[in-house]
UniProtKB/Swiss-Prot annotation:
Name of the protein: Probable prolyl 4-hydroxylase 8
Catalytic activity entry: L-prolyl-[collagen] + 2-oxoglutarate + O2 = trans-4-hydroxy-L-prolyl-[collagen] + succinate + CO2
Organism phylogeny: Eukaryota, Viridiplantae, Streptophyta, Embryophyta, Tracheophyta
EC number(s) per entry: 1.14.11.2
Transmembrane segments: 20-40
Lumenal side: 41-290
Annotated source species: Arabidopsis thaliana (Mouse-ear cress)
Length: 290
């Protein structure tokens, strides 16, 4: 007697709703990973927000806060503020401690000399009326405190320490200034030491009673929208300006994201009207600075 053929049992199929739920969970999981890595950001629910390029929106935008010191030591919290997208400029508030500011000033005082500028024809440093401050350079890794500051700057900029020049400490007295200029080079000599300058970090080591702003005359946007507009000197109102505040660090890029030079990074130091201005500058190059 012939055996009946065995009937093949079909495996139970997942319902369409189950498959959809699985896909949704996977998509949400991927989105959470991207948000955590900072690659993707969730849309803002603020209905009153302006367009991204509006200075009213991007000024005073807090991107990061971290506990740092307390009210007694006067160091406050560290937080990052977007100043401009053209040029790309950011202020890291309370980047330095009071002690670090005083340390850099004390290191520089014994060797201060009249500041110079780069001659575009020869690549050498020369005297110029456009720069009337005094200053000195500190070797990279001059001491443990300087090295700690330099490493922190690299963490802030994501540029290796070896791509940076040594810190330059500057002192401006009443009436002293630095006319608007670009930090990138126009000569063929200076680029041999590490390529073109890509970014600048300017740290303010002292408060200034009046004047001494860092001004960007070619910045895009309505520069009068900044909340500190009424505090600016006449020079400071000639462009987008940053007030010199002790412990703050200003980062701006001399190159665009496509590695082309950014003319809007034109900047200058306004004359000090009242008080003294101490600052420290770190220039970064495309390659290792030799």
């Amino acid at each position: 007697m012939a055996k009946k053929p065995k009937q093949l049992r079909n495996k139970p199929r997942k319902s369409f709703s189950t498959q959809t739920f699985t896909v949704v969970v996977l998509v949400l999981f991927v989105i959470l990973i991207l948000v955590g890595l900072g690659i993707f950001s969730l849309p803002s629910t603020n209905k009153t927000s302006s367009m991204p390029m509006d200075l009213t929106t991007i000024v005073q935008t807090i991107q990061e806060r971290e506990s740092f010191g307390d009210e007694e030591d006067g160091n406050g919290d560290r937080w990052l503020e977007v100043i401009s997208w053209e040029p790309r400029a950011f202020v890291y508030h309370n980047f330095l401690t009071n002690e670090e500011c005083e340390h850099l000033i004390s290191l520089a005082k014994p060797s201060m000399m009249k500041s110079k500028v780069v001659d575009v024809k020869t690549g050498k440093s020369i005297d110029s009326r456009v720069r009337t401050s005094s200053g000195t350079f500190l070797n990279r890794g001059h001491d443990e405190i300087v090295e700690e500051i330099e490493n922190r700057i690299s963490d802030f900029t994501f540029i290796p320490p070896e791509n940076g020049e040594g810190l330059q400490v500057l002192h401006y007295e009443v009436g002293q200034r630095y006319e608007p200029h670009h930090d990138y080079f126009f000569d063929e000599f200076n680029v041999r030491k590490g390529g073109q300058r890509i970014a600048t970090v300017l740290m303010y080591l002292s408060d200034v009673d009046e004047g001494g702003e860092t001004v960007f005359p070619a910045a895009k946007g309505n520069v009068s929208d900044v909340p500190w507009w009424d505090e600016l000197s006449q020079c400071g109102k000639e462009g987008l300006s940053v007030l010199p505040k002790k412990r703050d660090a200003l980062l701006f890029w001399s190159m665009k994201p496509d590695a082309s030079l950014d003319p809007s990074s034109l900047h200058g130091g306004c004359p000090v009207i009242k008080g003294n201005k101490w600052s420290s500058t770190k220039w970064f190059h495309v390659h290792e600075y030799n």
